[in-house]
Design a protein with these regions (language model features):
Chain B
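Hydrophobic helical h-region of N-terminal Sec-dependent signal peptides
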Residues: 8-14
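Flexible loop/hinge segments at secondary-structure junctions
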Residues: 20-311
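Bacterial N-terminal signal peptides that target proteins for export
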Residues: 1-8
């Protein structure tokens, strides 16, 4: 009896999230499905909500997403490897590093905006460009990737490492050939969560200059916008037709997310092991 | 692992190469070309965007970008020389002017449209139709003890007053407090503030006894859910409509909207052409952006400023 | 493959330095330094204006004052209402994310079929990808009226709706990371427990969860950090009326909402009102640092290592 009750409780937990997701998606699709026309995806913003398009935003978000993955996975996993496999845990500076990363996860996204504005846009002289946006997002979600990767590395049974060392492998060989492939699923999860969050961020991007009106395709070192910023702009307009258009934009955003996630999920499923 | 790494690297290289296209300024033809950067108030942003959209049809080689860092943020960038145009829902403040001067940034101030601030109440509040400025002041001033509608006017029922309005960082807030309470920033603190006027609409329409204020277009687009209150600024009760704002009879809650232009940018033909376009077509643009066009006197002033700036 | 060195007798330490290894260690350390550079950058960006701010407003007033109204005339600068607002929302969010997240994780890891898991886990992760703006509006437009319908008297902007939605948003974080940790627990442990006569509930709660505790607690800490730092949801749904209360049914303002609203608004840069952002940001940073130090100590104590 207790068995069934326990299982029921667990299912209930799962359903809270699923039901909320379902309700959200239903509302968004209800408003937004009718908005999915060619103009939304290929056109640019307009003062007529029915003609408003989000092409520059879509392209920019995709580009930033890919750049983000390219930056955050090596740096995040590299940090995790350093902390787990190489660093002497007794040293104070390594402990500080650990705490530091946990702390960065709590910093509000807007503070990353301030940071980006001061150091990347102005300090490094990058200006208000797409690359700066991608870099800020990288810093924002780096803690998530590091923490998830660390846990993934920790979960690899030590016997694997010992066995490899016993066969004469160097530390890096152990990591690259044994530990990392084993930890790949966890790393993939962390990357998925990080990417998902970054793609939906608005506040820091506005602060470093994401535009609400741009009529040409964004380039790496040029003015840019982002889909969540465009959505936020549309939602804030008084004309309610813009809100409907925003719903369409949200569907597109979720679509992009799904595609980018698919890659990471594929990786995760392929390398999932059970010890 | 290997094939994975290779695929991802390839994808990334493709992205970077695609992204390293030319700069934003479109090419040639026999028209003008260039990039004009505008930033500032999120209220005025849609106006500049509407103007940019229409301008592109005339001059396809010119690209205009619009940001919404806020009036203050816009001026900060403007006075560092980072932008060509600054959108503003209030005139430039003295401290901001000083920074511009220090950095050697000369500019021209253009009036581009008018906006009204509508005072609205919950649809069920049928006892009130018009409020005087004095009454509004008593409701909104700092330390105000007005808690119920009855405190506003003894003939009103004893219904709790639920106040909504823009946050203290908004230009609308600055303007309202300046005109109603008499000092910018002077307001009671116990009201529901929000960044986003659509949220204020929700608040007022959802609470019986609700009272709030925001730009005219937010009332017009949500007419069915709100009740507009006439404001008596000394000349009788006037309703907030486009006509009254343009005629100047909806006082004191009519505000002008500005675009500031950097003088050095003005030397570029595309910038001058853009401003000229705005002034020539201001009625059409204001209409598209849900604002009120300039009065005849304001238009004359703007044209004068343009003549001066063009040199 | 084992490398064969010519004739050298077995030794505990390699007789020549492997430069490749040193280079790699250096590169990895460099990666780690990125996070250090970020923190340093944040501190630099925050400290200077914050120090300016504290020259004008005393730290004592700031920390103990009970009214936060810096942008009004005259201003008051007591940060406690903002702190209470953050606490109220975070508390609700964690109360949702932790139990439901962990429950979902246990189900996915110990009860669900592999195929079901393959579908459900990514579905949950979609929840993590919904823009926070959408969550904010959902809280305002759906959750608040729903709360009123079921009889809870909430203000139109309130911490409860924002906290509930934030909690649901964090469920994937807790669930996905906890579930990965549980998946990584060697099957040998499970089989051993079954062999000793345990049933599924026992195995799940007394063997797997304790074994995966490090990862599970890490997911909790991450969720708490995210909850404290979340901006958009609270900006839209929790309100911008700093109130000195922990009652989640009231309108509040969190530290993050204040920073976001003021940072993107019309306040002239360089003014004392603008500098409040940095003072509040610094407070947030210091407070979470303290929390994380405590949390890391706790995690270290509870971590179980198998093998």
């Amino acid at each position: 009896m207790k068995q069934i009750a326990f299982r029921g409780v667990l299912l209930l937990s799962l359903s809270v999230a699923l039901v909320t997701l379902g309700t959200l998606l239903f509302t968004v699709f209800q408003d937004g499905w009718g908005q999915l026309d060619k103009t939304l995806i290929t056109g640019v913003n307009s003062s007529d909500p029915h003609q408003a398009g989000a092409r520059p935003a879509i392209l920019a978000t995709i580009e930033m997403g890919l750049l983000l993955l390219a930056f955050v996975v090596p740096i995040g996993v590299g940090t995790a490897i350093y902390l787990e496999e190489y660093a002497n845990k007794e040293r104070w500076y390594n402990r500080l590093l650990e705490i530091n990363i946990m702390n960065l996860a709590a910093v509000p996204s807007i503070v990353y905006g301030i940071l980006g504005l001061a150091f990347l846009v102005r300090g490094l002289g990058l200006g208000r460009v797409l690359l700066a946006g991608a870099m800020i997002l990288t810093l924002l979600v780096l803690p998530t990737v590091v923490i998830a990767s660390r846990e993934a590395l920790r979960a690899v049974p030590n016997s694997i490492r010992q066995g490899a060392y016993a066969l004469g492998a160097t530390r890096w060989q152990v990591v690259w050939r044994q530990v990392l492939p084993a930890a790949l699923p966890g790393i993939a999860t962390g990357s998925i969560l990080a990417l998902s969050r970054a793609i939906g961020e608005t506040a820091p991007l506005i602060m470093i200059g994401a535009l609400t009106y741009i009529a040409f395709d964004p380039t790496l070192l040029g003015p840019f916008t982002a889909l969540p910023v465009q959505i936020y702009d549309w939602i804030s307009q008084s004309d309610q037709d813009y809100t409907l258009r925003a719903a369409g934009g949200i569907i597109v955003l979720l679509g992009i997310l799904l595609v980018l996630n698919r890659v990471a999920i594929f990786v995760r499923n392929r390398y999932q092991k059970r010890w | 692992m290997r094939p994975l790494v290779i695929t991802l690297t390839a994808a990334l290289t493709a992205v970077v190469l695609a992204g390293c296209g030319g700069s934003g300024g479109g090419g040639g033809g026999n028209g003008l070309s260039g990039l004009i950067e505008a930033d500032g108030s999120s209220t005025v942003g849609p106006f500049t965007s509407a103007a940019a959209q229409r301008f592109k049809q005339e001059q396809s080689g010119v690209n205009v970008t619009v940001g919404i860092s806020g009036t203050g943020g816009g001026f900060e960038r403007f006075c560092r020389g980072e932008t060509d145009l600054s959108d503003a829902s209030r005139p430039i403040k003295d401290e901001e002017r000083a920074i511009c001067e220090k950095n050697g940034i000369a500019y021209s101030e253009f009036l581009v449209a008018n906006d009204g601030i509508a005072v609205v109440a919950n649809k069920q509040n049928d006892w009130v139709d018009c409020l005087t400025v004095a009454q509004l002041k008593r409701i909104w001033e700092p330390g105000s003890k007005v808690k119920s509608w009855q405190d506003v006017d003894p003939s009103f029922p004893d219904e709790q007053l639920k106040l909504f309005g823009p946050g203290t960082d908004s230009g609308t807030f600055d303007f309202f407090t300046d005109k109603i309470v008499g000092e910018e920033g002077a307001s009671r603190t116990d009201y529901s503030a929000t960044e986003n006027d659509n949220v204020t609409v929700r608040g007022v329409s959802g609470e019986k006894g609700g009272l709030g204020y925001f730009g005219l277009s937010y009332f017009e687009d949500n007419r069915s859910q709100l009740k507009d209150l006439k404001v008596n600024g000394g000349g009788g009760c006037v309703a907030p409509t486009r006509e009254t704002v343009q005629a100047g009879t909806y006082t004191p809650l009519s505000r002008p909207l500005f675009i500031y232009a950097k003088t050095s940018s003005f030397k570029r033909p595309e910038v001058e052409a853009f401003i000229r376009f705005i002034i020539d077509h201001e009625v059409e643009i204001a209409d598209a952006a849900r604002f009120v066009p300039l009065t005849a006197a304001q238009l004359k002033l703007a044209k004068q400023e343009l003549r001066q700036a063009a040199g | 493959m084992a490398s064969r060195s010519a004739v050298a007798p077995p030794a505990l330490q390699s007789s020549r330095i492997r430069w490749g290894e040193l280079v790699i260690k250096g590169m990895l350390a460099l990666c780690a330094l990125v996070s250090v550079a970020t923190t340093v950058g944040i501190l630099i960006a925050l400290l200077q204006p914050a120090i300016d701010f504290f020259r004008e407003i005393s730290v004592v007033d700031f920390l103990t004052g009970s009214e936060w109204a810096p942008l009004f005339e005259p201003g008051s600068f007591g940060v406690r209402p903002l702190v209470y607002g953050t606490l109220a929302v975070t508390f609700v969010a964690i109360a949702v994310a932790v139990p439901f997240g962990l429950g979902s994780a246990i189900y996915l890891s110990e009860y669900a079929h592999r195929r079901t898991r393959k579908v459900l886990k990514p579905t949950l992760e979609i929840l993590a990808g919904i823009p926070t703006v959408v969550f904010g509006y959902f809280a305002l437009v759906f959750v608040t009226p729903w709360l009123r319908d079921i009889g809870i008297q909430v203000d139109i902007f309130n911490a409860l709706a924002a906290g509930l939605v934030m909690g649901v948003m964090l469920i994937p974080t807790v669930a996905s990371l906890s579930e990965d940790a549980m998946q990584a627990v060697p099957d040998a442990l499970r089989h051993g427990a079954y062999a000793l006569g345990g049933n599924r509930v026992h195995v799940a709660t007394r063997v797997v969860v304790p074994a995966a505790l490090s990862g599970i607690v890490a997911s909790f800490v991450l969720a708490i950090s995210r909850a404290i730092g979340e901006t958009m949801i609270v900006l839209i749904a929790a309100g911008q009326q700093p109130t000195l209360t922990l009652d989640p049914r009231r309108t509040v303002e969190t530290m993050t909402a204040f920073i976001a609203a003021t940072g993107n608004g019309d306040v002239p840069r360089g003014s004392i009102e603008y500098k409040t952002i940095f003072a509040v940001g610094l407070t947030l940073f210091v407070a979470t640092y303290a929390m994380n130090i405590v949390a890391t100590r706790l995690v270290r104590r509870f971590r179980e290592v198998y093998e």
